[in-house]
From Swiss-Prot:
Gene name per UniProt: Tfr2
Induction description: Down-regulated during erythrocyte differentiation. Expression unchanged by cellular iron status.
Principal location: membrane
Residues carrying a glycan: 235, 334, 535
Tissue specificity note: Predominantly expressed in liver. Also expressed in kidney, spleen, brain, lung, heart and muscle with very low expression in kidney, muscle and heart.
Motif Endocytosis signal mapped to chain: 23-26
The name this protein goes by in its record: Transferrin receptor protein 2
GO biological process per UniProt: cellular response to iron ion; endocytic iron import into cell; intracellular iron ion homeostasis; multicellular organismal-level iron ion homeostasis; positive regulation of endocytosis; positive regulation of peptide hormone secretion; positive regulation of protein maturation; positive regulation of transcription by RNA polymerase II
Keywords annotated in UniProt: Cell membrane, Cytoplasm, Disulfide bond, Glycoprotein, Membrane, Receptor, Signal-anchor, Transmembrane, Transmembrane helix
The keyword Metal-binding appears for this protein: no
Length: 798
């Protein structure tokens, strides 16, 4: 009893102190000594904290300054319920706080990441928690700015035409660098593709000819190495016509002005659309050939910045597609048998790049009406008339060569979901120095490999595998990337989570653009808020945009272009993708796809800010990889596609009256969109109410989320006939864009004009429209059904 009194007195004396609990077993002489200490400490306490003196039932405690008799037994009985209640409250509060903290740790990396040393059994050891701020600091600590600039400079000095002997040397050098990093796998993948090159024995030529076809004057093509890969070969003769950018609307305007396009040679400017699109549109309007030149008005006029030389032509392929056009839909592996077909995107008319100097000579010969003011460029000696001009003959002698190209792969395996890949890639080859075209991307890619390897060595444990790829054949239309996708499509659509492209990432230091799938928009917004602007001190990239534009995404977000490797991942393989780019505020980077795309010109163009801009891109890509590779729940906004569908439905509503007159309706499309939105909302609620530490459940949700993009690939067309099956981004009769183009034929004036290749020369065909509408609707409905999960959760009232 004496021991219990002493302990109770000790609790009473310590009650005003901070809440620190230490348990120590005392008995015998130690307890007597402890009581003596207690009496001494109690004497020093102020009156209001005077402890009870407990000596037995016949004694009462007293305290100087006040007299409150407290019988010891009554005090014990009164204190016991309070002690029990306080204990329960503390236990309950601790349990709730621990539960909330644990759930939070399982969410996005904005909270925390649990990292376990790979050499220790996780069940036998404690866990080391790395928070998002820790991961950011670790990433920035290992990311090296100086190394990237050196790599850009050195890479741009090396010849790296796809399939060349010097490219093989570069491949080996990169493999040697990767072998020095802590990586799980490093390998190469070789494809044998058909690439087109100039014939050194028979150069391409351009001549003025008379009515009989006799040559009057030869126009020298200053650099015989500049050409358009995949151009049709042979002769093309016709009257010259100036056609602005060569868009469909430009050629429509020419027809409206009475300019004859059939049988002509078109002179068009670089920009707005790709070379392949310009040639495809010209072919649809009956032109015989296309000449493409860079007009000075399309590039920066800043006298303090370098400009493109007037004698320099711009390189560009003219295959309206990606990959090897001689094996469409099939991978170009060695010894593989292919059907005797070619891509429908190959042009049937020749095309050739020319310089501004040659274009000036051609424009001076044109007669006919003066071009609209907005069509006029900055060639000082030209009046910019529309034509026609004298007869011109173009001869193209390019030839096809079977060429081996090699992609390089490096992998860090995931620790929880190694069969799910976060992929990042950059083009390695270039026609010319290619500083901005591919040296920047290659430098960032290699630095990210080194950085993440160092992070893993220092405790970072990504849940999913990181796959770093250096592509070959990019200048010929993302050949290396597309052939790899074709070869492993059956695997990749189940395993690839996201693709991040580093191509063309630094073309200036003004505007920032993200060409991306809608699934990544919310994640990009989050990352932009955490990366500093390279040219606005004290601001993040998000603040740089948001302070000057009310809608940040309208300024930053753009659709994926066909000439990007990211396009193949999304439109062909159904993998969400993104490509970042810093651009000039007023004009495009003038040296892209020319021999003047050197490190020196890029450095001058950015006024010495190249290291800062490259660092910003690396931070964007790196933080994106961290989020995608280790968040328990994939940060993909699957609800965004509901807004995309609604936006497209707005275009269809314009024709609802015309359709009603024919007994047709768009109700099925509206219903499918509603089912998709409901499925997305239901999945979101399921995730919100689920246990985040349930690994099996989280994996099930992640599988459904990562396949959303794949759901929008039409299952009703053949990948061999229509490789780009995506109903929003793809090419073909199955797309929503083709459906809208077909609807426009309802109001066509009978002139035979068309707004796209798909509808050129055709009127509205009700049976074709019904088929288009049905296939589109069922693709959208299939996406809604797949997002719903199990078959018993699907709304079958469609």
């Amino acid at each position: 009893m004496e021991q219990r009194w002493g302990l109770l007195r000790r609790v009473q004396q310590w009650s005003p102190r901070p809440s620190q609990t230490i348990y120590r077993r005392v008995e015998g002489p130690q307890l007597e000594h402890l009581e003596e200490e207690d009496r001494e400490e109690g004497a020093e306490l102020p009156a209001q904290f005077c402890p009870m003196e407990l000596k037995g039932p016949e004694h009462l405690g007293s305290c100087p300054g006040r007299s409150i008799p407290i019988p010891w037994a009554a005090a014990g009985r009164k204190a016991a319920p309070y002690l029990v209640l306080i204990t329960l409250l503390i236990f309950t509060g601790a349990f709730l706080l621990g539960y909330v903290a644990f759930r939070g740790s399982c969410q996005a990396c904005g909270d925390s990441v649990l990292v376990v040393d790979e050499d220790v059994n996780p069940e036998d050891s404690g866990r080391t928690t790395l928070y998002w701020s820790d991961l950011q600091a670790m990433f920035l600590r290992f990311l090296g700015e100086g190394r990237m600039e050196d790599t850009i400079r050195l890479t741009s000095l090396r010849e790296r035409v796809a399939g060349s002997a010097r490219m093989a040397t570069l491949v080996q050098d990169i493999l040697d660098k990767l072998s020095r990093q802590k990586l799980d796998h490093v390998w190469t993948d070789t494809h044998y593709v058909g690439l087109q090159f100039p014939d050194p024995a028979h150069a391409n030529t351009l001549h003025w000819v008379d009515a009989d076809g006799s040559v009057q004057e030869q126009l020298p093509l200053e650099d015989p190495e500049v050409y358009c890969p995949y151009s049709a070969t042979g002769n093309a003769t016709g009257k010259l016509v100036y056609a602005h950018y060569g868009r469909s609307e430009d050629l429509q305007d020419l027809k409206a002005k009475g300019v004859e396009l059939a049988g002509s040679l078109l002179l068009v400017r670089v920009g707005i659309t790709s070379f392949a699109q310009k040639v495809a549109v010209a072919q649809d309007f009956g032109a015989q050939g296309v000449l493409i030149y860079p007009d000075p008005s399309d590039f920066s006029q800043d006298p303090h910045k370098p400009g493109l030389s007037s004698h320099q032509a711009v390189y560009g392929h003219v295959h309206l597609g990606t990959g090897d056009p001689y094996t469409p839909g099939f991978p170009s592996f060695n010894q593989t048998q292919f059907p005797p077909v070619e891509s429908s995107g190959l042009p049937s008319i020749p095309a050739q790049p020319i310089s501004a100097d040659i274009a000036d000579q051609l424009l001076r010969k044109l007669t006919g009406p003066v071009a609209p003011q907005e069509w006029k460029g900055h060639l000082s000696g030209s009046p910019y008339r529309l034509g026609p001009g004298p007869d011109l003959r173009l001869v193209v002698n390019n030839h096809r060569v079977s060429t081996p190209i090699s992609n390089i792969f490096a992998c860090i395996e995931g620790f929880a979901e190694p069969d799910h890949y976060v992929v990042i890639g950059a083009q390695r080859d270039a026609w010319g120095p290619g500083a901005a075209k591919s040296a920047v991307g290659t430098a960032i890619l290699l630095e990210l490999v080194r950085t993440f390897s160092s992070m893993v060595s220092n405790g970072f444990r990504p849940r999913r595998s990181l796959l770093f790829i250096s592509w070959d054949g990019g200048d010929f239309g993302s050949v290396g990337a597309t052939e790899w996708l074709e070869g492993y499509l059956s695997v990749l659509h189940l395993k690839a989570v996201v693709y991040v492209s580093l191509d063309n990432s630094v073309l200036g230091d003004g505007k920032f653009h993200a060409k991306t799938s809608p699934l990544l928009v919310s994640l990009i917004e989050n990352i932009l808020k955490q990366v500093d602007s390279p040219n606005h001190s004290g601001q993040t990239l998000y603040e740089q945009v948001a302070l000057t534009h009310p809608s940040w995404d309208a300024e930053v977000i753009q659709p994926l272009p066909m000439d990007s490797s990211a396009y193949s991942f999304t439109a062909f393989a159904g993998v969400p993708a993104v490509e970042f780019s810093f651009m000039e505020d007023d004009r495009v980077y003038p040296f892209l796809h020319t021999k003047e795309d050197t490190y020196e010109n890029l450095h001058k163009m950015l006024r010495g800010r190249l290291p800062a801009v490259v660092q910003a891109v690396a931070q964007l890509a790196g933080q994106l990889l961290i989020r995608l590779s280790h968040d328990h729940l994939l940060p993909l906004d699957f609800g965004r596609y509901g807004d995309v569908v609604l936006r497209h439905i707005g275009n269809l509503n314009e024709f609802s009256g015309d359709l009603k007159e024919r007994g047709l309706t768009l109700q099925w499309v509206y219903s499918a969109r509603g089912d998709y939105i409901r499925a997305a909302e239901k999945l979101r609620k399921e995730i919100y109410s689920s246990e985040r530490n349930d690994e099996r459940l989280m994996r099930m949700y992640n599988v459904r989320i990562m396949r959303v993009e794949f759901y929008f690939l039409s299952q009703y067309v053949s990948p061999a006939d229509s490789p780009f099956r995506h109903i929003f981004l793809g090419q073909g009769d199955h797309t929503l864009g083709a459906l809208v183009d077909h609807l426009r034929m309802l109001r066509a004036d009978g002139s035979g004009a068309a707004s796209s290749r798909l509808t050129a020369g055709l009127g509205f065909q009700e049976s074709r429209f019904r088929r288009q509408l049905a296939l589109l609707t069922w693709t959208l409905q299939g996406a809604a059904n797949a997002l719903s999960g199990d078959v018993w959760n699907i709304d079958n009232n469609f």
